[in-house]
Swiss-Prot record:
Pfam family, one: IL3
Name this polypeptide is given: Interleukin-3
InterPro entries named among the record's database cross-references: 4_helix_cytokine-like_core, IL-3
Segments for region (Disordered): 145-166
Molecular function as annotated in GO: cytokine activity; growth factor activity; interleukin-3 receptor binding
Gene3D superfamilies the record matches: 1.20.1250.10
Source organism phylogeny: Eukaryota, Metazoa, Chordata, Craniata, Vertebrata
Family: Belongs to the IL-3 family.
Length: 166
């Protein structure tokens, strides 16, 4: 009889603990906690900051102008600019790499992005001219709400410092 009573009380305790943890996992996140998990990106400000760091000369040739203006090519062109930035300006002289990466969160994805050719960059001067032209035509970007990547514990080193998550 004593054995059955102690087994029942153990089962009752385990059941109560299970219910308690289950309810805790289902609890809604308060507004204060949501703020820690999200941030806003003012996309038009990022574009203006990039434009301000680039020299004045605009793109003179019209051969790539239409593809740089085309809204369907926005994301694939941005990817090409991020990729080319590391090649033509590895020291990031204009300090625009992180802003280019942040803009990924501002542009919608499309199913055929990988099939599109994107912009062709020859050298640093070509990169600056085309990037400025491209940025000037990103005039309709809005502020977006993005999720923050998990913060590393104090004293730990984050392995992906250069990446930006949306």
């Amino acid at each position: 009889m004593v054995l059955a009573s102690s087994t029942t009380s153990i089962h009752t305790m385990l059941l109560l603990l299970l219910m308690l943890f289950h309810l805790g996992l289902q609890a809604s996140i308060s507004g204060r906690d949501t703020h820690r998990l999200t941030r806003t990106l003012n996309c038009s400000s990022i574009v203006k900051e990039i434009i301000g760091k680039l020299p004045e000369p605009e793109l003179k040739t019209d051969d790539e102008g239409p593809s740089l203006r085309n809204k369907s090519f926005r994301r694939v062109n941005l990817s090409k600019f991020v990729e080319s930035q590391g090649e033509v300006d590895p020291e990031d002289r204009y300090v625009i790499k992180s802003n280019l990466q942040k803009l990924n969160c501002c542009l919608p994805t499309s199913a055929n992005d990988s099939a599109l050719p994107g912009v062709f960059i020859r050298d640093l001067d070509d990169f600056r001219k085309k990037l400025r032209f491209y940025m000037v035509h990103l005039n309709d970007l809005e502020t977006v709400l993005t999720s923050r990547p998990p913060q590393p514990a104090s004293g730990s080193v984050s392995p992906n410092r250069g990446t930006v998550e949306c």
